[in-house]
């Protein structure tokens, strides 16, 4: 019995295309194959063996370049510790494939589609390759509709498009990941939608916190994992650049299955798209390509386009993508955020100044934009209210220098009124989050779009001029602000 199984393994190995490692430079391997047996670009190679300590090695690599002299250059998807020249590398004959479908919900995967949550293997036969073409023009859906998030500042001033691409821009520590967690929470609870979260090159601690948070809020159901609303794919900061560069594609592939086969609306979160570019830059340098502007890879636009063009709405379903974009040194002209801008339908820009004031979410109401904020899409009432809010805040911004030099008393009566309303608007744009209850001590609030519009209309019209501005801070709808004002008044007497 043992001899027959050994013969089977040997015959299987002979059938496979096996090369051997000739050079290892960090996560990059050069592999030599027999003449006429060269693997294709993006094929995955598997290196198995034992290191000098006798421990098993199993490293998957992706072919990136054909070098000539029957050699290929491949990038490893996991650590290359213990690999040696002369080790065998088996050509699988296909790109990386990952599990897809309902059984991925509630689970955490790595870039290879292997579960890393200690809950056992995925009971699933369906797999998709991570390299796929974008949908054809004829399959695309061009209908415009708003995606309500329950977050006042987003829904009013920079609404998201269903099936669109949204960028969350901000430097370190201004609240991008908290905003993403709130969106996952609101969408799962209010819309019953399925989400896929791609953790690309971020902190492992944040990934773990997000997982625990999702279990607490029942977005991931521990008792009945099949009722979970999200699949998680992580390629964190400690992973090699190959894994960080491809983990976004793994998450996108899982989302595409829900859209194309299950015909559902899906939310794809990528935190952080900058790390995808950064990993591509590292791989590009390791492959010996000449760097482009600011040291980025010359193929920056192509790599970004191949990912972004697959994120779209078809006649079968939609993928709405929300991408956190780390802005290096808060410089929006850096090639990485600038390239990302070109693909987005809406931008949510987070402001360090607002975060310093304690206004959360620290979304900049004047810098954030959306192609959806048009009167024929959102309606006249919404559009006029949003424009009124922006004009009031813009006037307040212009008056701030005068206030700093001369004080409020030197302003005209009209300008003093504008400043008072702008300060109320600024505070009313803050909102307690469900996922931040432990920090703020305030229960989270989901505010519907009609309630949001009504609240800001009342502030703009002057109906609430007699209420103190602190009554508008960290509340949900306008009724809560009025109740808070009454409580403040009662407390002050």
Curated annotation (Swiss-Prot):
Catalytic reaction(s) noted: ATP + H2O + 4 H(+)(in) = ADP + phosphate + 5 H(+)(out)
This enzyme's EC code(s): 7.1.2.2
Stretches of the chain forming a coiled coil according to its record: none
One Pfam family hit: ATP-synt_VA_C
Membrane topology: Peripheral membrane protein
Domain of life where this protein originates: Eukaryota
GO CC terms, sorted: chloroplast thylakoid membrane; mitochondrion; proton-transporting ATP synthase complex
Compartments in which it is found: Plastid, Chloroplast thylakoid membrane
This protein's UniProt keywords: ATP synthesis, ATP-binding, CF(1), Chloroplast, Hydrogen ion transport, Ion transport, Membrane, Nucleotide-binding, Plastid, Thylakoid, Translocase, Transport
Record: residues binding ATP: 170-177
GO biological process, one term: proton motive force-driven mitochondrial ATP synthesis
Gene Ontology MF terms: ATP binding; ATP hydrolysis activity; proton-transporting ATP synthase activity, rotational mechanism
InterPro entries attached to this UniProt entry: AAA+_ATPase, ATP-synt_VA_C, ATP_synth_F1_bsu, ATPase_a/bsu_AS, ATPase_alpha/beta_chains, ATPase_F1/V1/A1_a/bsu_N, ATPase_F1/V1/A1_a/bsu_N_sf, ATPase_F1/V1/A1_a/bsu_nucl-bd
PROSITE patterns: ATPASE_ALPHA_BETA
Listed HAMAP family: ATP_synth_beta_bact
Family: Belongs to the ATPase alpha/beta chains family.
Subunit structure, as described in the record: F-type ATPases have 2 components, CF(1) - the catalytic core - and CF(0) - the membrane proton channel. CF(1) has five subunits: alpha(3), beta(3), gamma(1), delta(1), epsilon(1). CF(0) has four main subunits: a(1), b(1), b'(1) and c(9-12).
Function: Produces ATP from ADP in the presence of a proton gradient across the membrane. The catalytic sites are hosted primarily by the beta subunits.
Protein name per the record: ATP synthase subunit beta, chloroplastic
Source species of the chain: Adiantum capillus-veneris (Maidenhair fern)
Source lineage: Eukaryota, Viridiplantae, Streptophyta, Embryophyta, Tracheophyta
